[in-house]
Amino acid sequence: MDAKIQNDLDLIKESVLQAVPAEAIYLFGSYAYGTPNEESDIDIYVVLPDGTAELGELFGDILMFLRKKKKRIDLDMKLGHSSVFNRRKNGPTLERVVAQKGIILYGL
């Protein structure tokens, strides 16, 4: 992975951890699988503790921290509560792909 992408991943991880009580942060998609192209965005899945605030509100909090860094990153971010992630990772779902093929950036 090149230095710019690693820098972006570090910034994303730092912003997520400042904004929300993440249990885990996964990188998935083309960057995780080593197949990015010029159209690729960074795909992130954030696992949150059960009982945390509304996911839409937390998503906004994370984006606010990224904006404070004055950095524009082409990012596709998904958030899910721990119990939902753990239940869905056993079926034919995005969570299964993330759990099986994703790269853990934080947690677990």
Predicted regions and their residues:
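Short beta-strand->loop micro-motif that forms the acidic, two-metal-ion catalytic signature
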Residues: 42-47
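Catalytic core of pol beta-like nucleotidyltransferases
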Residues: 1-24, 33-38, 49-108
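Glycine-rich beta-strand-to-loop/alpha-helix junction loops that act as flexible
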Residues: 28-30
